[in-house]
Regions:
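Phosphate/NTP-binding elements of NTP-utilizing enzymes
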Residues: 1-169
Length: 169
C-alpha cells in the first residue's frame, strides 16, 4: 500500500454527497481526476443493488496500470476489500475485481474499449455502475452501449476536440 493518504477537502466531500446518474471529470493530465473519480465510483458500487459493474479503459493493461494498481488506485484505497482477478476466476472468465461489501460481493468487470470484439463480448446485460477512463478516446459505440446498460456513469477525460461525438452526446 502507498504511504500517500487521500485527504478529503470540504469540496471533495460535497462531490461525494452529490447524487446524480452521470458525472464527467475533465482536466489536464495529472490533475487528480482518477483518484477522485475512482473513490466515488467504488462507493457507488457498494451502494448499488446490482452485483455486476464495469470499469473501462483503452485496454486491460491500461486499467491495471492507471486505475487498479496505481498509488491511490482501487487496490491501494480499498485494500483487503478488493481482489483483482486479472485472468478471471470461477464463474467469471474475464478480468474483474471482486469487491467485498457489507451487502455481499460485487463484481467489477475490467473491459478494454480499444478492441470492439472484446467489449462486444463483455456487454450484454444490465450493470449498476460504469467507470470509463479517458472517455474522449473511447469508441463512441462502446460509450453509447455501455451507458445505456448502466444506472450510473463516471467518466474522466482530458480536454480534447469539442467536435468529438462524446461532447455532443
Amino acid at each position: 500500500m502507498s504511504t500517500e493518504r487521500l485527504l478529503l477537502s470540504d469540496k471533495y466531500k460535497a462531490f461525494l454527497r452529490c447524487d446524480v446518474p452521470t458525472e464527467f471529470l475533465e482536466g489536464t493530465t495529472a490533475a487528480g481526476k482518477t483518484p477522485v473519480g475512482l473513490f466515488k465510483f467504488i462507493l457507488k458500487v457498494a451502494e448499488s443493488p446490482k452485483k455486476l459493474h464495469i470499469l473501462a479503459a483503452d485496454d486491460t493493461g491500461a486499467a491495471e496500470k492507471n486505475i487498479i494498481q496505481k498509488d491511490l488506485g482501487i487496490l491501494d484505497d480499498f485494500g483487503v476489500l478488493v481482489e483483482y482477478k486479472g485472468n478471471g476466476s470461477g464463474e467469471y472468465k474475464m478480468p474483474h475485481l471482486l469487491f467485498h461489501t457489507s451487502g455481499g460481493d460485487k463484481i467489477i468487470f475490467v473491459v478494454g474499449y480499444g478492441n470492439k470484439r472484446k467489449w462486444k463480448d463483455a456487454l450484454g446485460g444490465q450493470y449498476g455502475c460504469l467507470y470509463i477512463d479517458e472517455i474522449n478516446t473511447a469508441d463512441i459505440e462502446f460509450v453509447r452501449e455501455a451507458a445505456m446498460r448502466s444506472d450510473y456513469l463516471m467518466a474522466t477525460l482530458n480536454p480534447d476536440d469539442p467536435g468529438l461525438d462524446v461532447y455532443k452526446e
